[in-house]
Regions:
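Mid-to-C-terminal alpha-helical segments outside catalytic/metal-binding sites
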Residues: 1-60, 243-248, 256-292
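Conserved, mostly hydrophobic/aromatic
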Residues: 13, 82, 115, 148, ...
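Active-site environment of divalent metal-dependent phosphoester hydrolases
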Residues: 16-20, 68-71, 102-105, 161-165, ...
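Short aromatic-enriched loop/helix-cap "lid" or pocket-rim segments at secondary-structure transitions
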Residues: 20-26, 109, 167-170, 209-211, ...
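Alpha-helical scaffolding within the catalytic cores
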Residues: 43-50, 78-83, 110-112, 180-184, ...
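A structural motif corresponding to the C-terminal end of an alpha-helix
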Residues: 52-61, 87-93, 151, 186-195
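Active-site gating/metal-coordination segments in enzymes
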Residues: 59, 69-166
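Catalytic pocket-lining loop regions of alpha/beta-barrel enzymes
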Residues: 121-124, 129, 133-248
């Protein structure tokens, strides 16, 4: 049994619990939260959110998520909110993932550069291919990858099944194929100096994702959005074997709580050594080479 009151947590991907930043925006999306994530939508203040992270000894990187569907002028407003909150709670908000429609082109790249220049803490770029309707390997993302590679900041590319649109008519237009790990493989091959993190368990293509991780040394892995109870057997095994130095924790707060995830990880019977690697040591090693 792990003493979770002493475990440090480096959360590679969570969302905002505040009303302004909440990931699910429409009534239809919020109605799906109990079915898809087994939790209920509710809001907290920025201070309450920070106190929750602090209570669980967590450093967190947040993703507004919905900004990828907004015009760049509106995106700036939400980014300013995120950066200001990050500055105020630096001890628990390690950074922010910038989620921008790649079709914004040079204006979108300039926005990532603006956020990086704000010096609020870590800034990275996230690719939500399924939700934005553009797979990670599409040339529309190339200017963003080029900037990230030159600036030395990572790109987080989401893979596998997504809860976004799940259960809604037509999946809200989300094409799951845009989340196939082959898109990560393509980007990693074309940008060998780009630090890439694949995000989420990659079911139903988990073995393909494992193959990419074993083949491409510039690709790491974080596991937000799922309870470890539902990982494939191959992923469960590789976490303590060939991927033991490459896998990092992600929570997907507030859709998942730390309390639930700690209990579920505990039930998988990993050793203290492996859990420490997953929950903070691998992330600390990864970010030791990132300049921000």
């Amino acid at each position: 049994m792990i003493d979770w009151t002493k475990m440090r947590v480096f959360d590679l991907h969570s969302h905002w619990g505040t009303e302004k930043g909440y990931r699910l925006r429409t009534d239809a999306e919020k109605a799906q939260q109990p079915q898809v994530w087994k939790s209920a939508a509710s809001y907290v203040t920025e201070q309450e959110m920070a106190e929750y992270f602090r209570k669980h000894r967590a450093k967190t990187i947040l993703d507004l998520g919905f900004t990828k569907s907004l015009r760049i002028e509106k995106v700036r407003e939400f980014h300013d909110y995120a950066l200001e909150t990050q500055r105020k709670y630096r001890d628990v908000i390690f950074g922010n993932w910038m989620n921008i429609d790649p079709r914004s082109g040079s204006a979108g790249v300039a926005e990532v550069e603006r956020c990086l220049a704000a010096n609020s803490g870590f800034i990275g770029f996230i690719v939500s291919g399924g939700s934005v309707g553009v797979p990670a390997s599409d040339p529309a993302f190339d200017p963003f990858y080029g900037f990230c590679q030159e600036a030395g900041i990572p790109a987080l590319i989401l893979v596998g099944f997504t809860g976004t649109g799940a259960g809604l008519p037509g999946g809200s237009g989300v094409r799951l194929d845009h989340c196939h790990p082959r898109h990560v493989d393509d980007v990693a091959a074309r940008y060998p100096d780009l630090k890439i993190i694949a995000g989420r368990p990659a079911w139903p293509w988990q073995d393909e994702m494992i193959a990419v991780l074993l083949h491409k040394p510039n690709v790491w892995y974080e596991l937000h959005g799922w309870s470890p109870r539902f990982y494939t057997e191959s992923l469960k095994k590789e976490i303590s074997r060939r991927l033991k130095d490459r896998v990092m924790f992600g929570a997907d707060y507030p859709l998942f709580t730390y309390e639930r995830l700690f209990a579920d990880w505990d039930a998988e019977d990993y050793s203290q050594e492996i859990l420490e690697k997953v929950f903070y040591k691998n992330a600390e090693a990864f970010f030791a080479s990132i300049k921000f």
